[in-house]
A protein has these predicted regions:
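RNA substrate-binding interface of SAM-dependent RNA methyltransferases
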Residues: 25-117, 183
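Cysteine-centered metal-binding/redox modules
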Residues: 21
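Active-site/ligand-binding-proximal alpha/beta "capping" segment
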Residues: 116-163
Length: 187
């Protein structure tokens, strides 16, 4: 137990420590210049939230707003899954997502709801409006999706095109795909 990280927990062999660097060309996203913020509204799974923190850190999301009953990094399960990413992502808990979104719209943010829906436009067909560089992405509950009032208030309802049999993604997977796409559009 005291040697965890030095020896393999399965076989007991000594581990080799190697330097790990990633230079894949995507490191161009500069957190200081990112105008991408995200709302998680009533996401129930602590593990999904932790995974979302990792993706938010990886793709330089400027801020996460954890709304309603969405778990925060104060919970051990969120911290366990985020693997420390919560220390590098600005976040706050906001009890009312609709009020927050209304404020962001007044501040000039384009409000984009991400949800698997028959009425949603494909994410790949979306383009940023000229002069608009601030985007707020909305992600909803794993079972019930985005609150209808929030959906109605959004500037766009987008979905990730899926070609396989299962027509929906886990919210953490959808978050990762969406923030990668929007980060590349906004950079």
């Amino acid at each position: 137990v005291g040697n965890y990280g030095i020896y393999c927990p399965l076989c007991g062999n000594e581990l080799t420590v190697r330097e790990y660097r990633v230079d894949n060309g995507y490191a161009q996203f500069n957190k200081k210049d990112t105008a991408l913020e995200c709302v998680l509204d009533n996401v129930r799974s602590s593990y999904n939230v932790g995974s979302i923190f990792r993706s938010a850190s990886a793709f330089s999301v400027a801020r996460l707003f954890l709304c309603g009953f969405t778990p925060t990094p104060d919970q051990a399960k969120v911290r366990k899954t985020s693997l420390g990413a919560e220390k590098f992502v600005l976040w706050s808990h906001e009890p009312n997502a609709l009020q927050l979104i209304q404020q962001k719209k007044e501040q000039g943010y384009q409000i984009i709801a991400i949800e698997a829906s028959l009425s949603a436009q494909s994410l790949l067909d979306w383009s940023i409006k000229s002069g608009e560089q601030k985007v707020l992405l909305i992600f909803g509950n794993e079972i019930f999706g985005i609150d209808p009032e929030i959906r109605a208030f959004s500037d766009a309802l987008l979905q990730i095109p899926i070609t396989g049999d299962k027509k929906s993604l886990n919210v953490a997977a959808a978050f990762s795909i969406s923030v990668f796409y929007f980060s590349s559009c906004l950079s």
